[in-house]
UniProtKB/Swiss-Prot annotation:
One example GO MF annotation: lipoyl(octanoyl) transferase activity
Keyword annotations from UniProtKB, A to Z: Acyltransferase, Cytoplasm, Transferase
EC number: 2.3.1.181
Binding-site list for substrate: R72, G73, G74, K75, L76, T77, W78, H79, A144, I145, G146, G157, V158, A159
Function recorded in the entry: Catalyzes the transfer of endogenously produced octanoic acid from octanoyl-acyl-carrier-protein onto the lipoyl domains of lipoate-dependent enzymes. Lipoyl-ACP can also act as a substrate although octanoyl-ACP is likely to be the physiological substrate.
Gene Ontology BP, a term: protein modification process
Active site, renumbered: C175
Alphabetized InterPro entries for the sequence: aa-tRNA-synth_II/BPL/LPL, BPL_LPL_catalytic, Octanoyltransferase, Octanoyltransferase_CS
Biological source species: Paenarthrobacter aurescens (strain TC1)
Domain BPL/LPL catalytic: 34-214
PANTHER family, alphabetized: LIPOYLTRANSFERASE 2, MITOCHONDRIAL-RELATED, OCTANOYLTRANSFERASE
Protein known as: Octanoyltransferase
């Protein structure tokens, strides 16, 4: 395997968003240059709002809370304690296979949730992973995806709602979606599931896609 996993910090050692972004860019440059293997960063962020390239002004926090503009796709979202973040920085085997990459990210998260009895699905026309409307409520998003591919190497990634407070979402139009809500693995199961609880399973599931996704650079560490 040439894919590396690096756990930067989980509760209580939250990672500042800008610190994590700087590290992403540094690793991205090295992967592009063939100086480092493809790497997946795993962490929990300190609380922050981030705005993708498609964010509109009316979707920003209603109380004027600062927002970090980022170069990923998608719109406005929140990251913070209780949410597992994974930033795959991968040299894609198929540069044109971005849709396949996104679908694999969704499949990885769905497989992890199945272990906890959560019936998560994808919804046509909407990125991320969802719980369909049931007696608990309307359609609700349980995991988000926002990526960028530059020089054939991915950045940004996924956010899985494990045990995070949903109050910050009340201040924004999350991901530009007005007709659905958000949820967490803990809410769906009725028991506390923290990011640290699912890391090993996430890594295991992600590793199954290594050969299909990742191009092995010449001289990569084996």
């Amino acid at each position: 395997m040439t894919l590396e996993f690096s756990q930067l910090g989980l509760a209580p050692d939250f990672v500042d968003y800008m610190q994590g972004w700087d590290l992403q860019r540094d690793i991205h440059n090295k992967v592009v240059a063939g100086e480092k293997n493809s790497t997946v960063l795993i962490l929990e962020h300190a609380a922050v709002y981030t705005a993708g390239k498609l964010t509109e002004d009316h979707e920003r926090p209603f109380d004027g809370t600062p927002v970090v503009p980022v170069d990923r796709g998608g719109k406005l979202t929140w990251h913070g304690p209780g949410q597992l973040i994974a930033y795959p920085i991968l040299k894609l085997k198929n540069r044109a296979g971005i849709r396949d990459y996104v679908e694999r990210l969704e499949a990885i998260m769905i497989a992890v949730m199945q272990d906890y009895g959560i019936k998560a699905v994808t919804v046509k026309g909407r990125a991320g992973v969802w719980i369909l409307a049931d007696d608990k409520g309307p359609d609700r998003k349980i995991a988000a995806i926002g990526i960028r591919v530059l020089d054939g190497v991915t950045m940004h990634g996924v956010a899985i709602n494990c045990s995070n407070d949903l109050a910050p979402y009340a201040q924004i139009i999350a991901c530009g979606i007005t007709d659905a809500s958000v949820t967490t693995m803990s809410l769906e199961t009725g028991r506390t599931i923290n990011p640290a609880d699912i890391v090993d399973r996430f890594v295991e599931e992600f590793s199954k896609h290594d050969e299909a996704l990742v191009s092995t650079p010449e001289g990569a560490l084996q």
